[in-house]
């Protein structure tokens, strides 16, 4: 997200950060990516060496992808996801729904204000900083954990 919480503009990510993409690939390889239909369409295909789950109320089957109607349809035992980490990959509506269910949050902060039409929801009351994983002049990647209740 940018300094003003933007995560998207016209169904695209409004920045290009190859180092962030490399980190994302390393972190998610071998695990499960859960995303909304529009996010999947912006990527265009399943990412290699990961299980891709697309949440959509309207999409039919997509080759190489598990399509489910919503978050409540995800059952790791029934969907063959047991033992894998689930990564929520957007978009804004899915982040809003999933944040209360997440134990950890890995967040890229782009160190500038960006124009856009999709925003990351507030998370600061629910999560606390666990670790700064990467910090460079353009962006920072932070790991947050859900606060104890």
What are the functions of these language-model segments?
Residues 1-149:
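Enzymes that bind and transform nitrogen-containing heteroaromatic metabolites
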């Amino acid at each position: 997200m940018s300094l003003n919480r933007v995560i998207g503009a016209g169904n695209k990510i409004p920045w290009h950060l190859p180092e962030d993409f490399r980190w994302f690939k390393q972190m998610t390889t071998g695990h499960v990516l859960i995303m909304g239909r529009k996010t999947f369409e912006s990527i265009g295909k399943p990412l290699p060496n990961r299980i891709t789950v697309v949440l959509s109320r309207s999409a039919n089957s997509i080759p190489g992808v598990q399509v489910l109607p919503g978050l409540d349809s995800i059952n790791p035992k029934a969907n063959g996801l047991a033992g894998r980490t689930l990564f929520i990959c957007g978009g804004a509506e899915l982040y809003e729904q999933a944040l209360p269910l997440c134990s950890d949050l890995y967040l890229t902060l782009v160190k500038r204000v960006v124009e856009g039409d999709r925003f990351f929801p507030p998370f600061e009351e629910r999560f606390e900083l666990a670790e700064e994983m990467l910090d460079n002049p353009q962006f920072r990647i932070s790991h947050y954990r859900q606060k104890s209740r």
